[in-house]
Amino acid sequence: LDLGSGSGEMLCTWARDYGIIGVGIDMSQLFTERAKLRAEELGVADRVEFIHGDAVGYVADEKFGVAACLGATWIGGGVAGTIDLLAKSLRTKGIILIGEPYWRQLPTTEDAAKGCLANSISDFLMLPHLLASFDDLDYDVVEMVLADQDSWDRYEAAKWLTMRQWLEANPDDDFAKEVRTTLTLEPKRYAAYTREYLGWGVFALMAR
């Protein structure tokens, strides 16, 4: 189960590579349609189902061996609430996957936090404190995968290239001025703030 499944890449590739059966929920109709197309492209449309709907409060009729929410813990009102929500759709001894940012180093000011596109410093925890929060909820961390600065670079720079290509193809679009401004500012903002302060990880959890 993947709450906030986006364009479905994780479920589709897992179905292709590992033969899993899965369900994804996303509130974006565009992403849901892209996910369905991706499933067809990879030949796994019979193994994955993508539902256009609000994942807030979603509990599956059947239990899953893995329940995930990557980068969308607002669905449960935060990390703790999302873990509680996912647990309701999880088999005994199943694994919860939580994808969540954390501070690599604590921003020195609230403005620095906002430069990372956070609302405030309190939005995220330092990595040791995030791991401790799982412990407080009575979960063991059994695996984690963390982004490094190079993978952050690849992720962010791909957006810049996409914006540049879009501008070349749509110079007279109503949004062209806004996209041009974003493309001009984003590399500098990213280098000054997100790259230095913000980390990202996926954490595999099992209840005690």
Labelled PLM ranges:
Residues 69-72:
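A short beta-strand submotif of the Rossmann-like class I SAM-dependent methyltransferase core
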Residues 59-67:
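A short acidic, Gly/Pro-enriched loop at the edge of an enzyme's catalytic core
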